[in-house]
Amino acid sequence: MTPRRTGKTDGRLNLSHILLVVFIAALPLAAPLQAADLPPELPLWEKQPSDYPIGQAVKEQVRSVPAPPGSPSGLNRAFSSVSVPTYSIHRPRNPNGVGLVICPGGGFRDVWIDREGHDLALWLKDHNVTSLVLKYRTRPADLTPANAWQDYQRAVQADARQAIRILRKEAPDLGLQPNKIGICGFSAGGQLAMMCALQPEPKPPETEVSGMPDFAGLFYPGIPDDVGQLIENRTAPGSAAPGICPIFIMNARDDKLTPAAKCVDFYAKLLKAGVKAERHVFSKGAHGFGLGDGRGKSTALWPAGFAAWLQDSDMIQDK
């Protein structure tokens, strides 16, 4: 006769029970190890630029805070006092020919490299877009002379254009088309991307490839007050500069730092000038929402909308 089970144990645990307990106990410790492996940082310049040197009173600093929900990298770092710019390239297995420089935000005092850099790059990598995440030079705390801001802007734009050139130079090895190299950015990084798209490039040496973008993505960008004049300078009859590239703009209605109304006005000016542009204003998200997870159902859809816009702009070819 088969003994009846009483529900009691003899005090011994079998191997499967032990392994289960060990696995559950280790979960909190294992979580940080699941952060995505990121590509290495490489120096942006072979030699530090002598035209626009930016010195810092202290060495480069980094601080970390908890990563936002759904972060592909699992990291959330802010770099400050950056005097030596670097870059990292995310390479998909099957590149579709599109290359994109990503400029994180941080008010030009910080560079939020993960939530506004690597996270988007990892998302785009899954969609076969090659991305270069730029850690550009930050603004020193002691920029007080009247012309210092202009000096800094020239320096940081030089960093962004150098990143574009790197993708163009390495296009054959990266599987890119040199006429499909764009720039995008978040907040201050969006302003940087905008300035590279709107302002003509200082003439590079004869042997240098162009640092002008073929398209631009502006994600809750800072909009300067003179943006209308910048557009007019590039689109006025007789202007020697090439036309303004296609531009994608997105923001949240409740953004208090970079108000959506300024993006709407900027978009209207682009349309009036005949620039190919697309604009999205989401009902929720506030400022600094990165990929948008946890900030609003529609807000979290913006990366897919950006990728679709690249298709509509004939950057990504439909299959």
Give the role of each language-model region.
Residues 36-95:
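N-terminal cap/lid segment of alpha/beta-hydrolase-fold proteins
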Residues 97-105:
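Short beta-strand element of the alpha/beta-hydrolase
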Residues 112-113, 119, 136-175, 295-299:
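Catalytic nucleophile-loop/oxyanion-hole region of alpha/beta-hydrolase
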Residues 114-132:
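Short amphipathic alpha-helix adjacent to the substrate-entry channel of hydrolases
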Residues 158-242:
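Primarily recognizes the serine-hydrolase "nucleophile elbow" in alpha/beta-hydrolase
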Residues 249-251, 255:
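Short beta-strand/loop motif that positions the catalytic acidic residue
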Residues 256-262:
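Conserved alpha/beta-hydrolase "acid-adjacent" motif
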Residues 264-319:
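C-terminal catalytic histidine-bearing segment of alpha/beta-hydrolase fold enzymes
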